[in-house]
UniProtKB/Swiss-Prot annotation:
It catalyses: malonyl-[ACP] + acetyl-CoA + H(+) = 3-oxobutanoyl-[ACP] + CO2 + CoA. One of its GO terms (cellular component) is cytoplasm. Its main location: cytoplasm. The last Arg residue of the ACP-binding site is essential for the weak association between ACP/AcpP and FabH. This is Beta-ketoacyl-[acyl-carrier-protein] synthase III. Residues 273-277 are annotated as: ACP-binding. One of its GO terms (biological process) is fatty acid biosynthetic process. The gene is fabH. Catalyzes the condensation reaction of fatty acid synthesis by the addition to an acyl acceptor of two carbons from malonyl-ACP. Catalyzes the first condensation reaction which initiates fatty acid synthesis and may therefore play a role in governing the total rate of fatty acid production. Possesses both acetoacetyl-ACP synthase and acetyl transacylase activities. Its substrate specificity determines the biosynthesis of branched-chain and/or straight-chain of fatty acids. Keywords: Acyltransferase, Cytoplasm, Fatty acid biosynthesis, Fatty acid metabolism, Lipid biosynthesis, Lipid metabolism, Multifunctional enzyme, Transferase. InterPro entries: ACP_syn_III_C (IPR013747), ACP_syn_III_N (IPR013751), FabH (IPR004655), Thiolase-like (IPR016039). GO terms for molecular function: 3-oxoacyl-[acyl-carrier-protein] synthase activity; beta-ketoacyl-acyl-carrier-protein synthase III activity. SUPFAM superfamilies: Thiolase-like.
Length: 345
């Protein structure tokens, strides 16, 4: 648990591939479109074209983010890319992006799957908060359509491809000096910028619930094709559902308690867009009304590390976020790993 002062999100950006894959398209492959909607809330998703790689999506999202923040490539001090679908095992996708942008900045990948953007966000915020960087470009991006088996009718429909970006910069605010923060004098001691509270966690004992068994040093991919099924994402859907709901409930309450903020003070809740049933179940115990919960998984499906920044960018462009808003973010997924943070916009 921690908090980081002196940092804010100056801009966001996102990119999704042009190709839309609807539930009706998947029905032609043998998937049950009614089941998809009923069990997940997903209506369509985006798939990258052959030849498109993760860094290509990152590049487009980065350009839009920098433009939105009115920051030039030359001003970037650090690039962080959260992904589990890198262009290559090495070099990192962040280095591919750094080269293409023409930036002169260190760059590295962070691999925490659906929680990856939260890990990258907190990491980047550390650099800004302690004065070691002024402009940190944080990106979450995944081409999940390349990791799922088209023959797996229960898993293949869940995922899509996307990239989302946020630019972290220093903030000049420290403490609330008037009643303008939240409308009462009692709020005058609440930190008014940055990550008011965050929690990163992992439960590696549950790693097998959500994994790609082959392709690493433990189980290298062979040329005989015998390990073909192990190349794809394997998921214990029921187990992940129960774990995700529990870990969000616990971590969200911990974070709100640490920040001395109640759930009714929240302006917006942005969870990892995995499944509508998970989102509904997770927020119900917080007593957060549906209108304060941002959802776009119906359009994009589960985009893994891109999920939260994609949602943040859409929320910002839709006018759902204004200066001073309290935003609760939570990502959870393979590892098992999670990251929850309370951010003042």
């Amino acid at each position: 648990m921690g908090n980081l002062k002196g940092v804010r999100i100056a801009g966001t950006g996102s990119y999704v591939p042009e190709r839309i894959v609807t539930n009706e398209d998947l029905a032609a492959l043998g998937c049950d479109s009614d089941w998809i909607v009923r069990r997940t809330g997903i209506l369509q998703r985006r798939h990258a074209e052959p030849g498109q790689a993760t860094s290509d999506l990152c590049y487009e999202a980065a350009l839009r983010c920098l433009e939105n923040a009115n920051v030039s490539v030359d001003e970037i001090d650090l690039i962080l890319v959260a992904t589990i679908t890198p262009d290559h095992p090495t070099p990192s996708t962040a280095c591919h992006l750094q080269r293409r942008l023409g930036a002169v900045a260190p760059a590295m990948d962070i691999g925490a799957a659906c929680a990856g953007f939260m890990y990258a966000l907190v990491t980047g915020a550390q650099f800004v908060s302690n004065g070691n960087a002024r402009n940190v470009l944080v990106i979450g991006a995944d081409l999940m359509s390349r990791t799922v088996d088209p023959e797996d009718k229960k898993t293949y429909p869940l995922f899509g491809d996307a990239a989302g970006a946020a630019l972290l910069v220093p903030s000049t605010q420290d403490e609330c000096q008037s009643t303008e923060c939240n409308g009462s004098a009692a709020d005058s001691t609440i930190q008014t910028d940055g990550l008011l509270a965050y929690q990163l966690g992992s439960e590696g004992c549950g790693g097998e619930m959500l994994c790609i068994p082959a392709g690493g040093s433990r189980t290298p991919i062979t040329t005989d094709g015998e390990d073909s099924a192990s190349r794809y994402l394997q998921m214990d859907g029921r187990g992940v559902f129960k774990w995700a709901v529990r870990v969000f409930d616990e971590s969200a309450k911990d974070v709100l308690r640490a920040a001395n903020v109640s759930s009714d003070q929240l302006s917006l809740v942005v969870l990892h867009q995995a499944n509508q049933r998970i989102i509904d179940s997770a927020v119900s115990d917080l007593n957060v009304p549906p209108e304060k919960v941002f959802v776009n998984l119906d359009k994009y499906g589960n985009t893994s590390g891109a999920s939260i920044p994609l949602a943040l960018d859409e929320a910002a462009r839709a006018g759902r976020l204004k200066e001073g808003d309290l935003v609760l973010l939570c990502g959870f997924g393979a590892g098992l790993a999670w990251g929850t943070a309370l951010f003042r916009w």
